[in-house]
A protein has these predicted regions:
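Active-site-adjacent structural elements in enzyme catalytic cores
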Residues: 1-157
């Protein structure tokens, strides 16, 4: 975020979603998203489309029913809350599972653990990482932004 002043008060240029939700920032300042022109005008590494990408292909699944596992593929699961909270848990036999917010279901904890869990899955030797989506409210907007960027470079969609 880069603060600026205008005749009407403070203006925040939101480079990418972060831990403070846009709705909260709007309470204290006007919030704008900078216009993107060329890749060489990127102001923060997180603005690069695939900045957060693991080496292992990553797919973000919004609806568990949309995931159909392929035979012979070793899948890793990035789960938000873990057992009993996702029908993705039952979709296949997972080669490795990482849970962002074990037993708690707290978006803030999920945000803190996101890259730790992605790196563990990347090192686990799976063929594809499957990630559940999270609610796009509050810090969930930032989590989904990071997940989409991580999946952007994947050959599998």
């Amino acid at each position: 975020m880069a603060p600026e002043m205008s005749e009407k008060g403070p203006v925040l240029r939101l480079l990418r979603p972060g831990p403070i939700p846009r709705e909260d920032l709007r309470k204290i300042a006007k919030v704008i998203k900078p216009k993107r022109t060329k890749a060489d005008h990127i102001e923060a590494p997180g603005q690069i489309e695939s900045h957060y990408a693991p080496a292992t292909p990553l797919m973000v699944i919004d609806k568990p029913a949309d995931f159909v596992p392929e035979e012979g593929v070793k899948y890793g699961l990035l789960s938000y809350r873990g057992e009993g909270n996702s029908s993705l848990m039952e979709a296949t036999e997972w080669a490795h599972t990482e849970i962002m917010s074990p037993g708690k279901g707290k978006l803030a904890e999920g945000a803190v653990r996101l890259f730790y869990c992605l790196r563990k899955l990347d090192a686990a030797g799976v063929d594809v990482i499957i990630s559940e989506s999270v609610s796009e409210t509050g810090i969930g907007v930032a989590i989904m932004d990071r997940l989409r960027r991580a999946a952007a470079g994947s050959s599998q969609k």
